[in-house]
Amino acid sequence: MITNLCFHGVGVCAREREDGEAHYWVRESHFLRMLDEIALHPEVRLSFDDGNISDAAAALPALQDRGLTATFFALAGRLDDPASLRPADLRLLRSAGMPIGSHGWSHIPWRGMSDEVAARELVEARSALSEASAGPVDEAALPLGRYDRALVHRLKRCDYAAVYTSDRFPARAGSWFQARYSVTADDTRESIRARLSRRPGLEDARGLLKSALKRVR
């Protein structure tokens, strides 16, 4: 089993795009200490959602210093936003060996989308990110972590190689469905160490059950 950890922003959230976004940003000093711990755990996989510019400015050099890699799930609708990853930033990440994934176009929930909106979020966004990053975009991360059976079928029809959620339980390496633990402003190196060192328990079982129910509803 592996543990997927998801970051959203490093440093200070200057402007919240959604209520509560700042809670998912981590102080840079804490981030560096977390990476020091993560580097000791080869079973950990890292990813970054939302495509904030801190991915390239702060996260990339810290990852490189520790020989770590991560997948960066960017937003196609923010490629011209100075606070977000632009095409040059995506190409920089890719040239450093970091895979680029899709987080959609507008950071909206993907459940219950019309066919028109789904085409933009699942197909057009992927194409735009592939062009912007000059390479393939094979994986997707669900905005806000919401999904149901219909969305799972849509994503499979789009032939994504893997889909990442915000469900909190360990995942199987190579599985199409990848659950993740989101890192928040409350986390520290010590909390990350505790997460990675403990055995799967009741919380993980609850997460697995909730995920199974969402996939059949």
Regions found by a protein language model. Give the residues of each.
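Short, small-residue-enriched loops and turns at beta-alpha junctions
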Residues: 78-81, 108-112
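Short beta-strand and adjacent tight-turn residues that come in two discontinuous sequence segments
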Residues: 73, 103, 163-165
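C-terminal active-site subregion of NodB/CE4 polysaccharide deacetylases
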Residues: 1-47, 52-56, 112-139, 145-217
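Histidine-centered catalytic micro-motifs
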Residues: 5, 9-10, 99-107
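A short alpha/beta connector and helix-capping loop motif
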Residues: 54-77
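Charged helix-capping and loop-helix junction motifs
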Residues: 83-91, 115-122
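Acidic (Asp/Glu)-rich catalytic clusters
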Residues: 36-39, 60-68, 85-101, 156
